[in-house]
Amino acid sequence: MAGAVGGHRNGYVRWVRDAEAALAFHFDRHDVADVLLTPRYWEILRLQEDNREVTPLVNQEMEARVADLEELRATYKLLRDRFSQETRRVLVPDTNVFLHYTFFTQAPWSELAENSDPRIIVPLLVLEQLDRLKFSPNQKTAGRAQQVIRALSLMLDDRSATPTNIPRGGTIEVFVDEPGHLRMASEDSEIVEVTRQLTGFLPKPARLVTGDLGMRLRAGALGVEVVAIPEEWQLKATNQSTPSI
């Protein structure tokens, strides 16, 4: 009896670890941990293998996790359908790209994508940062943020997830957080994580577009591709500096 109980428990633990490893390639690792590594999971780990409470706990937990995994499966299918057939290079710009470089509608994005028209995907967090910066005490920063938000609003309308053409070639769209997603404490890390997550659905890796050294280092540590922004894209310095976010 003890062997059967222990086998049930150990089989469940292996299932959780295998599921965590598989899902983390496509979803935010913290979201996956929230789904699988529940308080009941840790309670099961603490129990002795021959404890009679193990089997009912495992059964209850498996039933609950299967329901959660069905939701993840539905999300996975939506993302797979949206990205898996994409042949273009996907670029993920951070917020400073919109603030300190050539205005996004006029930038030659193809230079960052093997001279082909790219698919530009803007994390929702980047839009939220730009929205906050509209009220920056730095007038230059506030003005640029307002211009970007106004242009994006006109282009995307209420179809943020639908790629929209931009003047110099390529398309732009917004990547909205999945339901229940808990963001990372570091906003830079969150943008890097979005790029990593997109790569899991694409035929070729998404590229993070940033001029920020810290973000480049974070991306490199996670194996995320980064593309350097050409110096000629950078706005000329003025007496009124635009601070990084």
Predicted regions and their residues:
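Long amphipathic alpha-helical scaffold segments
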Residues: 49-89
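Active-site-proximal, substrate-binding regions of enzyme catalytic domains
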Residues: 2, 22, 80-207, 213-245
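Charged interaction/catalytic cores of defense and host-pathogen modules
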Residues: 1-61
